């Protein structure tokens, strides 16, 4: 009986923790203008807070598997929840943009460990016969988080106070730690092997300095010279890592996986696509609130339409892929997605609410098909023994791309406003940013068009072999 309870409750615990992380990743976007006023900053400068969270997620993902093997999955998962709760408290108590940015990075680190280690727990604790049902639990946060986050954040910001957004995580986190201690066994590997610390310092440090340096070019927190130096040092560290990874047998992030055609197209093409998609959750609430004068809750009601569009498309994705194949879908759908993103730049004060909602809905509908296609095909030609390491590389690139999207959007928005001579954001300042990030998603066609016509057939049609050209 106790084993049955543990087999049921372990996936529920992990799913709840993932839901907390998924909601938190989306909850602040509708609160950004109000937070900016509280910190005495321009709303665009809060891009650094969004970027720091994504960065915390990205740079720590590669070490999560090793930590779980070395210290035990339960111990790391429990610590991850604790770090996330501490980060939430720090966010709620922040009195400046600098402290809030650091707090969001801490949250990102906790979130980075929660998701992959949670999957490890499911794999080790749940019986194989129950594995599919357990994974279904884990799919719920990915679907509901993007919808619940903007709604919850908008409601709390409009009718209560934005700081209360982060207090929600505290009781949930404490309960999660208690349930983890009670129901999840602390499994570990007897011989985890060494961690590539040199690779971790070079890749994590390089990515952090490069992305944060770009985000700080507006001169709000540091001087432009300091931001430029950070960016250059980060780029140099990443370059050194590329040379280092070629000479090490098992580097932390094995760049040799890019030699696999489907992996290369999915990750590199997906990176361009995610630059566009990563910017939308940042830009959309700003244009709705600062440009069109909506409240945080009103913008949340519209922003969540994207998540509903994504949910609907997921029910059709398998059928679409079987009918047209990965290459065709990835190419045409990237174009549709880029157009849908750019269309958000057409919003002006007289735009009907129903039309805005429809465009945002389509802005979630087409990207959901793209993500499903990319995620399904990424590891199609990777040997099963290498999937774990390939996943680490793919996950890091994905997160960095999302953060880069926010940074690019913020830079374009700042330039446009300066050209227009606006002291505060106006609706007319946003269209160039939407067009630029929409073009980034559109440009992913240049990578995915190199795929063979039958790429991914093994997945959608059950073929044993895939021929690539």
Regions found by a protein language model. Give the residues of each.
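Intrinsic disorder in cytosolic terminal tails and internal cytosolic loops
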Residues: 1-6, 189, 449-469
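12-transmembrane solute porter fold
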Residues: 7-23, 28-30, 43-44, 49-50, ...
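MFS transmembrane alpha-helix packing/gate-lining sites
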Residues: 24, 53-60, 110, 141-145, ...
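Extracellular/periplasmic helix-loop-helix junction of adjacent transmembrane segments
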Residues: 31-61, 97-101, 297-301
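Small-residue (Gly/Pro/Ala) motifs that create kinks and tight helix-helix packing interfaces
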Residues: 32, 145-157, 161, 210, ...
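Membrane-helix boundary and inter-helical linker elements of multi-pass secondary transporters
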Residues: 38-39, 44, 69-70, 92-95, ...
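Helix-loop-helix hairpins in multi-pass membrane proteins, especially solute transporters
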Residues: 61-198
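Hydrophobic transmembrane-helix bundles of small-molecule transporters
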Residues: 158-269, 294, 302, 437-438
